């Protein structure tokens, strides 16, 4: 049984075409508190709930859905979180701070046996979840979307930390891959250079987990153009776009596409097949 939370309503139509969805009542009390009610009995359920804006509200709703399902006799619960809130707060940078993602994952572990997230910022943080936790990369979906557009192109990561993401897509498509090396040349300027790869005359796909301002991608694109790249495409799992970022990035590249973990005007790649694989 699939339960769709308010944070994943934008995925409901596509999911409903392929799988039955459990009837759930979700509303707000006049004071703003959430009310949830499970309208069907069962033994196992998968909750799909993204936690992007309003993060706290959708997290509380995920907990209430878990509690309601347990109260209604469900014994085995999984939760799929397309976008995991607080995932970038994964370390203490100033004394007195929490490790926010740890707090969130421990709370979810009170109700859910298994957790599946799409491309979490730091996969190592999933160790904070007490049950089974899995990080899912939408490599197949991104590869399929760009396959014909890229031709015999190259996959690049914007930095070494994102190299595994580029590698996964490149291996599906049978293409070369590499990453940009960043070198600070002054207090205000960072130099970016593709490592050990020739982009001249090639189509290039730059891929990352999250795009916010798009500044890194724009700079990388400018460098690739100077090096003679043919077309430059940019993709990411999560489009956490700052104001004006889509417009600026779309002007700089040949195509910008992100998945629909967060609904945006450029959410052209669906992660629903990955959700359905868990049924």
Swiss-Prot record:
Cofactor list: Mg(2+)
Record bears the keyword Methyltransferase: no
Residues binding Mg(2+) 2: 159
Residues binding Mg(2+) 1: 121
UniProt entry tagged with the keyword Methyltransferase: no
Keywords, ordered alphabetically: ATP-binding, Cytoplasm, Kinase, Magnesium, Metal-binding, Nucleotide biosynthesis, Nucleotide-binding, Transferase
InterPro entries: Pribosyltran_N, PRibTrfase_dom, PRTase-like, Rib-P_diPkinase, Rib-P_diPkinase_arc
Gene3D superfamilies documented for this protein: 3.40.50.2020
Function per UniProt: Involved in the biosynthesis of the central metabolite phospho-alpha-D-ribosyl-1-pyrophosphate (PRPP) via the transfer of pyrophosphoryl group from ATP to 1-hydroxyl of ribose-5-phosphate (Rib-5-P).
Entry protein name: Ribose-phosphate pyrophosphokinase
Organism: Pyrococcus furiosus (strain ATCC 43587 / DSM 3638 / JCM 8422 / Vc1)
Taxonomic lineage: Archaea, Methanobacteriati, Methanobacteriota, Thermococci, Thermococcales
């Amino acid at each position: 049984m699939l339960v769709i939370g308010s944070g994943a309503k934008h995925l409901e139509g596509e999911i409903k075409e392929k799988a039955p969805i459990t009837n759930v009542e979700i509303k707000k009390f006049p004071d703003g508190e959430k009310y949830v009610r499970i309208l069907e009995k069962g033994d196992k359920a998968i909750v799909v709930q993204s936690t992007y804006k309003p993060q706290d509200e959708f997290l509380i709703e995920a907990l209430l859905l878990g509690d309601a399902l347990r109260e209604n006799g469900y014994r085995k619960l999984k939760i799929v979180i397309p976008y995991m809130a607080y995932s970038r707060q994964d370390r203490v940078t100033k004394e007195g701070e929490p490790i926010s993602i740890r707090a969130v994952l421990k709370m979810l572990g009170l109700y859910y046996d298994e957790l599946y997230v799409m491309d979490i910022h730091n996969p190592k943080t999933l160790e904070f979840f007490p049950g089974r936790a899995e990080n899912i990369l939408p490599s197949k979906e991104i590869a399929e979307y760009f396959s014909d557009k890229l031709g015999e192109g190259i996959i690049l990561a914007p930095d070494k930390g994102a190299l595994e993401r580029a590698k996964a897509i490149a291996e599906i498509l049978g293409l070369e891959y590499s990453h940009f090396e960043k070198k600070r040349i002054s207090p205000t300027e960072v130099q970016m250079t593709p490592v050990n790869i020739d982009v001249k005359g090639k189509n290039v796909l730059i891929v990352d987990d999250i795009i916010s301002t798009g500044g890194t991608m724009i700079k990388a694109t400018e460098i690739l153009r100077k090096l003679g790249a043919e077309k430059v495409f940019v993709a990411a799992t999560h489009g956490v776009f700052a104001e004006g970022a889509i417009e600026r990035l779309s002007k700089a590249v040949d195509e910008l596409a992100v998945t629909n973990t967060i609904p945006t005007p450029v959410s052209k790649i669906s992660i629903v097949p990955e959700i359905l694989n868990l049924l």
